[in-house]
Amino acid sequence: MKQITNIYILVDTSFRNERNKEKLQTILNKYSRALNFEKGKAKLHIIGYNDKAKILHPFKRITTNGNPNLSEGLKLLESVIKYQRKYDEKQTRSVFILHGSDNVLQGWNAPLERLFDLKEFAFGLRYVVQYGNHDKYAKQAFSRFTESNDKILPYFSENRLTSLLSSIRRVV
């Protein structure tokens, strides 16, 4: 059985991120294109969050509305991880990329702590791609998500993702 690397991407689809909508669409297309080279060794899971969270398709147009409610995205991420655990027996280290805007609503603490109870999230590689100048709540949320300020990045390129996936393959 093949070993699968799961890539989970959380995208802020609130009104606050309207100005980055086209950039996000391009980035999601590039992520999907990067995974085409993996040919069944990696799965891409894209979760958009605002007042409600939903699964996104990389080639369908992103619509923005609502507030940047990160807790909704984290709850759906927890459900997706548990679902993947049932069906992917041979998993490698997971990759989590959070594309956040400059604002986050409060209430993200409890869902994030529940995620740290899942081994896929606790031992996964976690990055934040942040747009704009973040407020103190966004800074706290992003720092806690990555557990390291050096993983809060201004961008995350297609090349970085492919090299990260190949390094995971070499370790496993």
Model-inferred region functions:
Residues 46, 126-128, 150-154:
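Conserved beta-strand scaffold positions in the cores of enzyme catalytic domains, especially
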Residues 27-30, 72-80, 110-111, 163, ...:
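Well-ordered alpha-helical segments embedded in enzymatic catalytic cores
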Residues 60, 114, 133-172:
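Von Willebrand factor A/integrin I-like adhesion domains
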Residues 2-57, 77-80, 93-100:
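Von Willebrand factor
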Residues 65-67, 103-148:
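VWA/integrin I-like adhesion module and closely mimicked acidic/polar interface patches used
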Residues 65, 91-92:
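A contiguous binding-surface segment within folded domains or other stable secondary-structure elements
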Residues 18, 38, 50-82, 86, ...:
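Short, charged loop segments at secondary-structure junctions
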Residues 35-38, 88-89, 116-124:
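Arginine/glycine-rich "motif VI" loop of SF2 helicases in the C-terminal RecA-like domain
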